[in-house]
From Swiss-Prot:
PANTHER family: PROTEIN-L-ISOASPARTATE O-METHYLTRANSFERASE (PTHR11579), PROTEIN-L-ISOASPARTATE(D-ASPARTATE) O-METHYLTRANSFERASE (PTHR11579:SF0). GO terms for cellular component: cytoplasm. Pfam families: PCMT. This is Protein-L-isoaspartate O-methyltransferase. It comes from Nitratidesulfovibrio vulgaris (strain ATCC 29579 / DSM 644 / CCUG 34227 / NCIMB 8303 / VKM B-1760 / Hildenborough) (Desulfovibrio vulgaris).
Amino acid sequence: MRRNRERMVRQQLMPRGISDEAVLAAMGCVPRHLFVQEALRAQAYEDHPLPIGNGQTISQPFIVAFMSQLLEAKPGMRVLEIGTGSGYQAAVLAEMGLDVYTVERIREIYQTTRDLLRALRYTRIRCRLDDGTLGWPESAPFDRIIVTAGGPEIPVPLVEQLADPGVMVLPVGVSRRSQELVVVRKRDGKLFRSNRGGVSFVDLVGCHGW
């Protein structure tokens, strides 16, 4: 599988603009095949999403790498992830030296992923079962926030929990089938938004989502 990871980095990520050395190293290290269903492990390093059950998916490797790069995170930063899912994105961020707080709303996925992350000894990851659109207020502020599900707007609680300066990366769109990948920068109390292309994520469900 190590060769598959190396091939993924070399053929799928680097030619498409992933240049952050920490991101590339993490993507080449995290065992993605352990985060997918056993029957789908042969496809783990192919560049497309895969189902993980309960109507949820693990994002394709390029999107995971792209969003991680857009965070512009430095080791030791605190990152809030909304939508734990398979746990793969959280593992990549932890491998980059970040302290990850991740929230999942589906109990079955939360329990399975929490146990997997513990088994793999990702001690920098804290998991929580809750409405992700509410964030993790008692542990705020966060240097970086990443959302791995698409909602109609940027959740206000997440903006409030983003440090200043800080960066948030999330999919936003009025359509439940397609969104724009948005980068929000908070600086001196102001928000600066930029769009980074079309994406398609599962729904962000909660008080400040669908």
